Structures are given as C-alpha cells and as structure tokens.
Design a protein with these regions (language model features):
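Active-site metal-binding motif and surrounding structural segment of the metallo-beta-lactamase
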Residues: 310-314, 322-380
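Divalent metal-coordination and catalytic microenvironments
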Residues: 293, 307, 317, 331, ...
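Conserved beta-strand hairpin/beta-sheet module of binuclear metal-dependent hydrolase folds
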Residues: 285-334, 440-452
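PEST-like low-complexity, intrinsically disordered acidic/proline/serine-rich tracts
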Residues: 10-272, 368-377, 461
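Metallo-beta-lactamase
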Residues: 289, 312-313, 320-322, 373-519, ...
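Accessory terminal helices/loops
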Residues: 269-277, 364-367, 487-494, 503-572
Length: 572
C-alpha cells in the first residue's frame, strides 16, 4: 500500500516545453502596451507615481538604454513565447533546475531546485535575478532576489533593485498559469500581483536575437537624460489625460493600494518587510572574486580592491584605520605575495585610513623610489593624484591631518597614469567629482573598474565641496565610467564596476545612478530658473522619487545636504 501512495517527488509536474502566451483582458497591455498615465491596478506609492510621470520614452534612444531587456518581473508579460527546459543532475538524473528563456525578455533565467542559497547582498544584480524554488503540491514556488531596477509596465512604471519576486508555476495539462507577486519597498505600497497564462505549443520557434546599439538621435549633448520635469505639460498630461479619455473618476488611474480594493478602502495591515539587508555591512570583512585576478573586500569602510598575481599584490583603497589588521588578514586569504602597490582613489579616511598599515606590511619592487619619500624603498608604494597628497600633507603650513607614513609616496599631476603589473595594463584616470583628487582605476585585462566614491549603490553621491567636489564633476565622472564600461550582453556583465560603497555593479547600474543624479540636477536647475530659494527648493522635494532608495534624514550625508549641494552647484 505504501508503495502505491504518491510521493511529493512523483506528484511534481514537468514544466518543460515551448509555451505560447494567452491574452485575455490584458491584451492591450501586451500589444501595443499600456497608455501613458495608466497606473490602474498597481499599488504605487507617491515616489512610484513621480518616477512614472517623469519617464520620457525618448530615454530608450540613448545608447546605454537601447539594449536593456525586460527583467523577469515583466518579461513574461510581453507579446512573445517562452521555452522551459529541465536541467538534470548528471549522476542522479534528478531535476536540479529549470532554464527559462523568452523571446521578449531575452534574459536566460535559471530556477534552482537543488537547495543552494541566495547570494549575499553585495553580489551583482541581473535582469533575470537569482531564483530558487521548491514544490508546494502541484505548484512550483519560486523566490527571486538580486534583480536590477526595471519596469513593471512599459509606460514608465518602475521597480527598484530592492524588489523581490515570488511566483507560482502551475500546470494543468497543456496549460500553464504563472502567478507573480512583486514586492518593492521603494515604489510599491504593497505587493503587486498578476497572473499570466500559457498554452503548450511545441512548434514555436524560440531563438536568441542579436542587438547592437546605434546612435538614434543626432546632435544630442553628451550626458543628456530625457525626462519630464514635475509640473511640465507632458508630466501633467500623464496625470489627467488617460482618466479623462476613459471617463474614470479623478485619481483612479493614478494607482495606489487603495484603488485596488472595493470602494477604494485599503484594509489596515502591519508591514512585514523587515530591515533592508542591502544597507548593512557584514561584521567580518568578506572577500569576493570578481573576475580575472581582481577581488573585492567588503566591510572595512569603503570597498577595497585587490589584484593578486606573480609579481605581488596591488591594493586600491585601504579602509578605515581601526580595520587595518583585519584588512591585511583578508588580503592574506587571497594571496601571501608581498603588497607592492597601494592606490588611493581619494583622500577620505574610510578609503585611506589603513595606508600606513598596508604599506608597512609590503615592499616595493626594486630600489626605485619615485617622488620625494624614501619609504618606498622599504614599504609598498602609495600612489594617488597630487591633490590627495596636498589634502593629506597640508602644504600651506597648517598641521598635517594624516601621519607622514600614510601620505602618497608617488603622485601624478595630469589626467591619467599608466601601470603594468601582474601581466595587466592598469589605467589611473583623474576624474574630480566627489573630491578634486578622485581617480578611477581600470584593470584592462580583468575588465574591472574601481570607481571610488564617484559611484555608490547605497546613498546619494557625497559632494565634498571643501575638498573640491562638485555635482557636475560627479555627473561627468559617471558619464566617463559609462564610456569605459562595455556590457557583455543586453546591458549586463562584461565590465564590472566596484563602487566606493555598496554591491558589485556593471554599466546598467552606473546608468541608473547617473540618470538619477542628472534628473535631480535638472529639477533643481529648473526651480532655480524660476527664482526659488534654497528653502523653497527643499520644500519642493526634487528627490522624492529617489529618497526611499538613496535618501537619509540622519547621519553624515542626508538628503537635505545633497539637495543643498546641488543647489549651490547650480547657482555658481
């Protein structure tokens, strides 16, 4: 009798096959796509509405936006088909994963069933995200994290890179239903639920397409980001035109959780979203291999980059002073070769605080000591832009803020410096923005860029005006990063970017950050042109669609401080 009872494994349904989409009431949302201003049925918050109202479709003509696929939060909604293929364990022949590929999303997605954990918070994000699954009766429940920022609809309704997704794949004979639940603490008041239906269609031709970017608009200014300013005619049209055309009650087309309930009344509930894992540094310093011979250390202040090879170790930034011994121990887990070169991306102590410790633990190659300091004869060389040395040494006669042994032993004055170390060409590019001594470091063979604090995934960019920083400098630096980076496929991977703080990134993440800074700058500039004072600019909250993602009301760098820095920069 026991042998005849169905086991959970035997009860699982095979989801593999070629599937064609079935369109019902949502057909207009598939082809040609939802109308501008149609946010019906979406539990958008105020930030999500402003984000959608600001969206200008011409942004898709930018080279860095053209090849972006739809993330897995939306790719199943397109007017196309999908292929699901089983991945089998070569020994046991058990299904360990499903591979899902769609002609609309174009991002191959692996859904793992073998019990593997999700990556840590500082790992790179992708369009497909990282998906794990388990069977719950006849439904495959899938949980996806590590998603890039993308779209919930093709009319500007967005989700952030903090979004997560839960799905249930349910097969009934030749029909497949997928229930998708997207939760985004940045742009949604509550999880957004929708279903998509498919029919088995073995004869479907599902193939990958090649996409190359082109210049679609001639004469566009470098770094221009198309968007609608708040209160502009185009933004206001989104707020009124759709509801007016379809004679909908005022506000009903604007989305929001209450509009999805009978009589527009949302039941009271307690949020269970919990703390944000993306803003919490690990207790222990963690090492992550990026690619080539380049690694990233997280947890010692600013991010640290380690290049290791036969010639020794090169370190970019050194973290805070109190963590020097821990940083050195973490480096020794990567390689026991001598530390030869230390590079500072800028002057701040969270990136240069352990200079003295790491330099003393190393030794430069040969006896050549460029610059004025004999320390490089015994210790590792410390390289930085000349402005970093000026800030550390206070040559004007004031007391030096940093000990002599922490100063750069070698500097450069111009736009760049070139090294060749561990069989790899390395470019140091002076790009003032966060401070006047900022440099970007490009490992050309490993295809990894260290951005310093020109780019961070955690906060608004810190503008240190006292040390020569400027908002325009940050924007110029971000555009320079975009010029350097080349994605592998569909604006993903390829050149990886290590931010000054936060998770591993690529070009698409830099583009998202560049767009944000540029849009905020343009909004403040528009208010200044209208004669608004600083207090009035702050009251207009030009950052409110980004505050949930990058803002802060307390701490060393608040939203108010960022807005004031932008205002001061625009007023120059």
């Amino acid at each position: 009798v026991l042998l005849m009872a169905p086991s959970p494994v035997l009860a699982q349904r095979d989801l593999s096959g070629n599937w064609a989409g079935l369109y019902h009431e949502d057909q207009p949302h598939r082809i040609p796509g939802p109308e501008l201003g149609d946010y019906t049925g979406i539990p958008l918050n105020d930030a999500g509405r402003l984000k959608a109202d600001s969206w200008d479709a011409s942004i898709l003509t930018l080279r860095e936006h053209q090849a972006k696929p739809h993330p897995s939060t939306y790719s199943l909604r397109g007017p196309a088909n999908i292929r699901i293929r089983r991945e089998l364990d070569p020994v046991t022949q058990e299904t360990i994963a499903y591979e899902l590929f769609g002609t609309f999303g174009q991002a191959t997605r692996m859904i793992w069933l073998d019990g593997r954990p999700h990556p840590p918070a500082h790992a790179a994000h992708t369009w497909a995200g990282f998906s794990t699954a388990r069977w719950d009766g006849n439904a495959l429940e899938v949980v996806t994290t590590h998603l890039k920022a993308g779209w919930l609809q093709r009319n500007g309704v967005a989700h952030s890179d903090r979004a997560t997704m839960t799905e249930r794949f349910i097969r009934h004979g030749n029909h497949l239903m997928v229930v998708t639940i997207v939760d985004d603490p940045i742009y949604l008041e509550e999880p957004f639920i929708r279903t998509t239906n498919w029919v088995l269609s073995p004869d479907q031709d599902i193939r990958r397409t090649q996409f190359d970017v082109v210049d679609e608009v001639a004469g566009r200014r470098k770094g221009e980001v198309p968007h609608y300013l708040p209160g502009s005619p185009d933004a206001m049209r989104k707020q009124t035109e759709f509801a007016s055309n379809y004679k909908l009650p005022a506000g009903s087309a604007r989305g929001g959780a209450a509009t999805t309930y009978p009589d527009g009344v949302r039941p009271l509930e307690t949020s269970n979203r919990g703390s944000d894992p993306f803003t919490v540094l690990p207790d222990q310093i963690q090492a992550v291999h990026i690619q080539g011979n380049v690694h990233m250390l997280i947890g010692a202040g600013g991010n640290i980059i380690v290049q290791a090879g036969e010639e020794g170790i090169l370190v970019i930034d050194t973290g805070t002073g109190p963590r020097g011994a821990d940083v050195l121990a973490a480096i020794r887990q990567i390689s026991d070769k001598p530390i030869r070169i230390v590079i500072n991306t800028h002057v701040h102590g969270d990136h240069s605080g352990s200079n003295e410790t790491l330099a003393a633990a190393g030794r430069a190659l040969g006896g050549n000591a460029p610059g004025n300091f004999g320390l490089a004869l015994e210790n590792a060389r410390i390289l930085a832009h000349e402005n970093v040395l000026k800030r550390m040494s206070a040559p004007s006669g004031e007391p030096s803020p940093r000990p002599f042994a922490a100063w750069p032993t070698e500097t450069f004055f111009g736009d760049d410096k070139e090294l060749f170390f561990n069989d790899e060409a390395i470019q140091l590019i002076h790009q003032p923005g966060h401070t006047d001594g900022d440099i970007v470091v490009f490992f050309r063979r490993s295809d990894v860029v260290a951005s310093g604090d020109l780019f961070t995934t955690l906060t608004y960019p810190v503008i240190d005006a006292q040390n020569g920083g400027s908002v325009q400098g940050v924007i110029d630096g971000l555009n320079r990063l975009i010029d350097i980076t080349i994605p592998k496929d569909k604006e993903e991977g390829g050149t990886y970017v290590v931010p000054g703080h936060g998770r591993l990134a690529d070009e698409a993440d830099v583009v998202e950050f560049r767009d944000m800074v540029t849009i905020v700058r343009d909004r403040v500039q528009d208010l200044v042109r209208k004669g608004r004072t600083l207090a009035e600019v702050k009251a207009a909250t030009p950052t409110r669609d980004y505050d949930g993602r990058y803002g802060a009301t307390t701490g060393p760098w608040t939203t108010d401080m960022f807005v004031e820095a932008v205002y001061r920069d625009v007023m120059r």
